[in-house]
C-alpha cells in the first residue's frame, strides 16, 4: 500500500507538462568546422537539469585539443528556471579551467573559478550585489515563455538576463527580429523565433580590452529558439555571431525533444 501511495503522490506531482531535449551541434567559423557538442535538457514540473559536452575538431584541433563539459540544475519557481548549481570544465593541451557556482533563490552562495582572474587595477571588481539575482551561463540559454499561447513567439525575445559565470557579471539582452522555419537532420522541423542578442558587461572585466569592446559594439549576433516538446521552454537551435575571422555559427544537426507525460513517469516509479 505504501508503494501505491508513493506512486500516486509522485504522479500527482508530475502532472504538469514535462519534456526532454537531446541536441547535437556543429560549430563553424567562416564555414570551416571547428567543433561539435551535445546538450541534454530535462524539464520537470518543479525542477530542471541541463548537461553539455563538446570538443574541437578540424583545423582548430590542430592548434588546441580542447574539450569541455558543463552542467546546471535548479528549480521551476513561479514559472521561471532558477538555478541552484552550475559546474563547467574546459581542458586543453596546456590548461584546465574549472568553475563551480552554488545559488539559492537567484543569489550566489558560493563559487570557485580556477585559474582566478589576474588582480589588475583596471579591472572592475565584482561586488556582492553583482552576485544577487543572477543565473549561470547554461541556464541563461534556456527561455521559459509565460502565458498559454504559442511559446514560439516574439515574446520569447523580450528579456534581459543577468548572468554570472564565476568571473564576470554581465547582462544578455535580446529583441525580436523575425520568424523562420528550420529542419534538423534529425528531430525538429517547424518554426523558430529569431532574437537579436546584446552583451552588456557589468563587472569582472577590463574596459579597455579589445574583446570586450567588440562584444559591446556587436549588433549582428542572433539566436534562433525552438521549443522543447511538452514544455513552454525554448532552447537554441542556431546561433551566429560575426568574428574577425568570419561568421561564427553553432547549428543543431539533431534537435530531438519529447514530452514526458505524467502517466509515463508514474509507471516507472
Specify the residue positions occupied by each region the protein language model found:
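C-terminal segment of classical bacterial N-terminal signal peptides
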Residues: 4-14
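Acidic, serine/threonine-rich low-complexity disordered tracts
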Residues: 15-105, 149-269
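Internal, conserved structured core segments that host functional sites
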Residues: 91, 95-139
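Long, charge-rich C-terminal accessory regions
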Residues: 137, 141, 147-149
Amino acid at each position: 500500500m505504501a508503494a501505491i501511495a508513493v506512486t500516486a503522490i509522485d504522479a500527482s506531482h508530475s502532472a504538469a507538462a514535462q519534456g526532454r531535449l537531446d541536441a547535437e551541434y556543429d560549430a563553424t567559423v567562416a564555414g570551416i568546422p571547428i567543433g561539435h557538442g551535445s546538450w541534454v535538457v530535462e524539464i520537470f514540473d518543479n525542477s530542471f537539469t541541463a548537461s553539455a559536452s563538446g570538443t574541437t575538431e578540424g583545423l582548430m584541433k590542430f592548434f588546441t585539443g580542447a574539450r569541455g563539459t558543463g552542467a546546471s540544475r535548479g528549480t521551476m519557481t513561479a514559472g521561471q528556471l532558477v538555478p541552484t548549481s552550475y559546474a563547467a570544465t574546459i581542458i586543453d593541451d596546456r590548461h584546465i579551467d574549472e568553475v563551480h557556482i552554488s545559488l539559492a533563490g537567484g543569489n550566489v552562495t558560493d563559487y570557485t573559478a580556477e585559474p582566478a582572474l589576474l588582480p589588475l587595477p583596471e579591472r572592475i571588481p565584482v561586488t556582492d550585489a553583482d552576485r544577487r539575482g543572477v543565473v549561470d551561463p547554461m541556464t541563461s540559454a534556456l527561455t521559459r515563455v509565460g502565458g498559454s499561447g504559442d511559446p514560439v513567439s516574439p515574446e520569447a525575445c523580450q528579456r534581459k538576463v543577468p548572468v554570472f559565470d564565476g568571473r564576470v557579471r554581465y547582462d544578455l539582452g535580446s529583441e525580436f527580429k523575425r520568424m523562420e522555419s528550420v529542419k534538423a537532420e534529425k528531430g525538429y522541423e517547424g518554426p523558430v523565433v529569431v532574437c537579436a542578442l546584446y552583451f552588456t558587461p557589468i563587472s569582472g572585466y577590463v574596459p579597455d580590452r579589445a574583446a570586450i569592446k567588440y562584444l559591446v559594439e556587436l549588433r549582428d549576433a542572433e539566436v534562433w529558439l525552438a521549443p522543447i516538446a511538452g514544455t513552454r521552454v525554448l532552447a537554441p537551435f542556431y546561433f551566429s555571431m560575426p568574428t574577425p575571422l568570419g561568421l561564427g555559427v553553432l547549428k543543431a544537426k539533431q534537435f530531438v525533444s519529447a514530452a514526458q507525460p505524467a502517466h509515463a513517469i508514474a509507471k516507472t516509479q
